Amino acid sequence: MVEPLLSGVVLGLILVTLSGLFFAAYQQYKRGNQLNG
């Protein structure tokens, strides 16, 4: 019963990491546009 929980945790971590990276890139992109414009 531990494997499904572990796979769920790993999947959650991957999703959180991807969303975090995307959010950081979006913030940097917005900041760059503000500086250029």
From Swiss-Prot:
Please report the name of this protein according to its UniProt entry: Cytochrome b6-f complex subunit 5
The record's principal subcellular location, in a coarse class, is membrane
What the protein does comes down to:
Component of the cytochrome b6-f complex, which mediates electron transfer between photosystem II (PSII) and photosystem I (PSI), cyclic electron flow around PSI, and state transitions. PetG is required for either the stability or assembly of the cytochrome b6-f complex.
Bilayer topology annotation: Single-pass membrane protein
Keyword Thylakoid listed? The answer is yes
Summary of subunit composition and partner proteins = The 4 large subunits of the cytochrome b6-f complex are cytochrome b6, subunit IV (17 kDa polypeptide, PetD), cytochrome f and the Rieske protein, while the 4 small subunits are PetG, PetL, PetM and PetN. The complex functions as a dimer.
Gene name of this polypeptide: petG
In the record, biological process GO terms are: cytochrome complex assembly; photosynthesis
Which InterPro entries does the record match to this protein?
Cyt_6/f_cplx_su5, Cyt_6/f_cplx_su5_sf
